[in-house]
Amino acid sequence: MAHLNAATLINAERSDCSLRLLENFPSLTITVRQDTSGRDLVASTYSATGMSAAARNLNPLANFRHMRQPGYLRPPHTALKPLPLRTAIMNGYESLTRHNGQIQVTPGLRELIKECAPELHESILPATVQHITPLSLATRLSMVCAGLHCDDLVETRPVTTSLTVAFTTKVLILAVDPDEAKLAVNARGADHLLTVDGASTILTNFGYDIRGNVRRDAPQALSPSDLPDCYPVLWLGAVAGLIAVQLETDLDQLGMNLTEQKTLTAHPPAVDAFMRKLQSFALLSSRLFHLCVAHALEPFRDMAALLRVWQAPTLVQIPEVSLAIKGPSIEVQGNGTQLFQVRAAPIGGM
C-alpha cells in the first residue's frame, strides 16, 4: 500500500458540493455549486438548470438517447413512491395529483398536439387529462418526436426534423409577426403559443459549437423553417410555447409562495444567472420580455425585486425598443443603447 501523506489526503478530499433551489418549480430550478478548497473562501457558482433542461427538449434525439440503451428502465412512478417533480418531468411522467404548476387543457392545445403528432396524440395527451404540467407535455411530445412511445418507450418512427437537428448544440428561439413578416415579441401572451396559429409564429435556428481549430463539416446555422415541407416544424414551436407557459406559471406561483422565497434570501447572485438564461426565451412572451428589459435598465438585487416587477409590471416604465440581428444573436436596443442580447440556448448534442 502506497504511503499517503497529509497533502495527498487533502487533495483527495472532495471539496465541492451542490444543492438545488426551487425544485418544486420545474422551469425555475437553480443549481448552486460550492467549492470549499480555497482557504477561508467558499466559491459559489449558480446556473439556471431548470431552463437548461427544458430547452433540451428542442433536440429530442440527443435528450433521450439514454432511453434507447438496451435494458433501460424508467424509475417507477406510483402513488406510494412518487418521484421528485424534476425527475418525473424528465421521464415524461405527469403528477397523479393536482398541483400549482399545471395548466388547464384547452381545445386549442389538443388541436395543437394532434397537428404535431397525428398518430400518437392520444398517448401524448389522453382525453381524460384535464390539467397537465406544460413541461411534462413538452417532454412527452419530444419523446415521440425522438421515436419513442411516451408510455412504454417502444421505438417508433422519429420525426425527420429531429434527425436533422440531432447533432446541433444550441438553438436561437425567435418570434415573428406574420402580418408584417418581421421579428417581433409575442405580444399576445404565452398562452397564445399553445394554439396552431400561435406555435406557427415561432422560428428556431439551430447552430453548432466550433472551438479552436476543431472543424465540423456542417453549416454554422440550420433553420428547419427553410427546409422542404416534409420536415415538420410545428412541434418545435409547440415545445417552445410550453416552456414559456411553464415559466410564466412558475413565476406566478413563486410570487405567492413566501416559504420558497425565503430560501433565496441567502443567494442574491442567483438572480443574475437566472435572468441571463431567461433572455434566451424573452421573445416568447411580452411579460418575459418586459422583465428582461427591466433587469437591463436596473438589475434586480434579489429575487424579491424580480417578483415585484413580475407582479406589477407598471413599476418599471420601459422605453421603446427595437430588435436587430447581430451575428448569432438578437440585439435588443432602447434609448440608443444595447439593453441585452437574446442568445442561443445550449441544447446538448449527440
Curated annotation (Swiss-Prot):
GO terms for molecular function: RNA-directed RNA polymerase activity; single-stranded RNA binding. Keywords: RNA-binding. InterPro entries: Reovirus_polyG_pol (IPR002507). The keyword Magnesium does not apply. Homomultimer. Belongs to the aquareoviridae NS2 protein family. Protein that binds to ssRNA and may be involved in genome packaging. This is Non-structural protein 2. It comes from Aquareovirus G (isolate American grass carp/USA/PB01-155/-).
